[in-house]
């Protein structure tokens, strides 16, 4: 690994299972390679997560807070509250909002796009990191279009990047 060349899956598993002094050596090599590649500069973003609904059809347990639409604890924020939270985040120095939520059973086809347009209207300079791959698939399905077309629409609506979770 210290050569900087790609390693095999089997070699990665060996490194992943390292214990004791070997674990410390893996860390030292990783730190050396990082320093060679990018130096000591560390960057970050000030981010606010806006989970606009916890109502979800999946019941997968990933987020641990989802609710069935019939449950009392289920909520869906109005777009005005979502944009208020984005503005508040920006006021406090956030450069990015992460917009994610459950998959509500009665979701309008254009909901995700509308949320992004409203956020960008109110806070044009904020970076929208929005919608998990599962939400994108769900939005495309609800809109009866391909995921490629749906991603294009989300980009046009203001999504800057997408998370890789869920």
Regions picked out by a protein language model, each given a short descriptive name:
Residues 4, 30, 60, 99, ...:
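Conserved, mostly hydrophobic/aromatic
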Residues 1-49, 53-57:
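Flexible, acidic/Gly-rich N-terminal and inter-domain linker regions that tether
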Residues 67-166:
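Conserved Radical SAM active-site core
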Residues 6-7, 59-61, 123-124:
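A broad, low-specificity signal for short, low-complexity segments enriched in glycine/proline
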């Amino acid at each position: 690994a210290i050569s900087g060349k790609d390693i095999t899956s089997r070699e990665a598993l060996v490194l992943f299972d390292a214990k004791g002094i070997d674990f410390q050596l893996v860390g030292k090599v990783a730190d050396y390679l990082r320093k060679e590649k990018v130096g000591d500069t560390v960057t970050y973003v000030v981010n606010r997560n806006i989970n606009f609904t916890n109502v979800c059809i999946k019941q997968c347990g990933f987020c641990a807070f989802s609710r069935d639409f019939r449950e009392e604890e289920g909520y869906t924020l109005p777009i005005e509250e979502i944009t208020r939270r984005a503005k508040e985040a920006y006021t406090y120095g956030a450069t990015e909002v992460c917009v994610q939520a459950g998959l509500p059973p009665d979701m309008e086809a254009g909901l995700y796009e509308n949320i992004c347009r409203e956020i960008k209207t109110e806070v044009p300079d904020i970076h929208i990191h929005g919608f998990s791959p599962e939400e994108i698939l769900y939005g495309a399905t609800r809109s009866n279009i391909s995921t490629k077309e749906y991603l294009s629409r989300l980009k046009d609506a203001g999504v800057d990047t997408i998370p890789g979770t869920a």
